[in-house]
Amino acid sequence: MEADVIKLLAAGLAMGLGAIGPGIGVGILGFGALQAIGRNPEAKGSIFTNMILLVAFAESIAIFALVISIVLIFVA
């Protein structure tokens, strides 16, 4: 295989595998937040605020994977 093909394959794997974890995590987080709101509707504001903050933290992992894949394509 040529070096360019290997670089593109590595970048694709880095982004694909780096996005699986945050995707699953955000799904579980949303499920838990909706269950909590269903049990205690008065706490909706607090639960929603915490959920948005944690979703941002989870998605930062996917952004790091994107940066790594871009570095693999253009720098390595």
UniProtKB/Swiss-Prot annotation:
Superkingdom of this protein's organism: Bacteria
A GO term from the CC aspect: plasma membrane
Keywords: ATP synthesis, Cell membrane, CF(0), Hydrogen ion transport, Ion transport, Lipid-binding, Membrane, Transmembrane, Transmembrane helix, Transport
InterPro entries: ATP_synth_csu_bac/chlpt (IPR005953), ATP_synth_F0_csu (IPR000454), ATP_synth_F0_csu_DDCD_BS (IPR020537), ATP_synth_F0_csu_sf (IPR038662), ATPase_proteolipid_c-like_dom (IPR002379), F/V-ATP_Csub_sf (IPR035921)
Protein name: ATP synthase subunit c
Subunit structure: F-type ATPases have 2 components, F(1) - the catalytic core - and F(0) - the membrane proton channel. F(1) has five subunits: alpha(3), beta(3), gamma(1), delta(1), epsilon(1). F(0) has three main subunits: a(1), b(2) and c(10-14). The alpha and beta chains form an alternating ring which encloses part of the gamma chain. F(1) is attached to F(0) by a central stalk formed by the gamma and epsilon chains, while a peripheral stalk is formed by the delta and b chains.
Cell location: Cell membrane
Site positions (Reversibly protonated during proton transport): 59
Major localization class: membrane
Species this chain originates from: Dehalococcoides mccartyi (strain ATCC BAA-2100 / JCM 16839 / KCTC 5957 / BAV1)
A single GO molecular function term of this UniProt record: lipid binding
Family: Belongs to the ATPase C chain family.
Topology of this chain in the membrane: Multi-pass membrane protein
Underlying gene: atpE
Task performed by this protein: F(1)F(0) ATP synthase produces ATP from ADP in the presence of a proton or sodium gradient. F-type ATPases consist of two structural domains, F(1) containing the extramembraneous catalytic core and F(0) containing the membrane proton channel, linked together by a central stalk and a peripheral stalk. During catalysis, ATP synthesis in the catalytic domain of F(1) is coupled via a rotary mechanism of the central stalk subunits to proton translocation. Key component of the F(0) channel; it plays a direct role in translocation across the membrane. A homomeric c-ring of between 10-14 subunits forms the central stalk rotor element with the F(1) delta and epsilon subunits.
Transmembrane segments: 8-28, 55-75
Cleavable signal peptide: none
